[in-house]
Amino acid sequence: MLGFAPAPGRPLFVLFGSSIVQFSFSNGGWGAALADIYARKADILLRGYIGWNSRRALQVIDKIFPKDSPVQPSLVIVYFGGNDSVAAHSSGLGPHVPLEEYIDNMRKIADHLKSLSEKTRVIFLSCPPLNEETLRKSTSTVLSEIVRTNETCRLYSEACVSLCKEMDLKVVDLWNAMQKRDDWATACFTDGLHLSEEGSKIVVEEILRILKEAEWDPCLHWKAMPTEFGEDSPYDLVSSSGQSTVNPSDWTFHRTIQWD
């Protein structure tokens, strides 16, 4: 049993998924950006597992998200589907999960997460597109041939979005969000599959948009959340007048992107 132990009174956000989640704290990734945006507002916990599919996630979801944990997450952001969509290997091994089973697995994952508490909110991320040519060149020779195509990514992405509409879940449609950029194929990936800093910016923007627009109580958008120990203090920096202090708790000058 893993369980969670955030700072007292601070909400917990869990990022759960495959390599796009595991790598999200590297190279300007979207997880690292969220951790910065929510500094002193929420604890961002990484539960990313490279190579995983929805079948493997479902097998251990009770261990990763135990229902008897004394602390339950306020938000879980979930990504599975890219590995599920890989073509089936002739050996029967590998990450491929048939589309109908993928849909059923994601439904069960959503049901489990929604049952954790009345305040646990869920956002799914759908499959992004690929740069197939770059991916073919970057795939390690230690692996058997891996067949990933944009056509199957599209099918699994559309299935995820449709499921979320059916279940009244929030979803980031990465398939379409990425392709709003004319240069998405070259700008949004490091290896044709995993997200670059530019690709991660799109993920962050879409997540923040959902959190801002969602009619959730309490609101989980960063601007609506209190800053931990954000009260004025005589120990803050002294103002130019020399007669008072300036509270820096919510300063964001260090960010190259001023997120909405």
Swiss-Prot record:
Induction annotation: Down-regulated by wounding, drought stress, salt stress and treatment with abscicid acid (ABA).
Tissues with expression: Highly expressed in panicles. Expressed in shoots, mature flowers and seeds.
Organism annotation: Oryza sativa subsp. japonica
Pfam families: Lipase_GDSL_2
Entry's localization field: Endoplasmic reticulum
Residues the record marks as active site: S18, D191, H194
Residues carrying sugar: N83, N150
Keyword Repeat: no
This protein's name: GDSL esterase/lipase WDL1
Role this protein plays: Involved in the organization of leaf cuticle and wax crystals.
Deletion phenotype: Mutant seedlings show a severe growth retardation phenotype and die within 30 days, due to increased rates of water loss.
Keywords from the UniProt entry: Endoplasmic reticulum, Glycoprotein, Hydrolase, Signal
Enzyme class: hydrolase
First-listed, main subcellular location of the protein, grouped into a coarse class: endoplasmic reticulum
Signal peptide range: 1-35
Molecular function terms, GO-annotated: hydrolase activity
EC numbers for this chain: 3.1.1.-
GO annotation, cellular component aspect: endoplasmic reticulum
InterPro entries: Iah1-like, SGNH_hydro, SGNH_hydro_sf
Family: Belongs to the 'GDSL' lipolytic enzyme family.
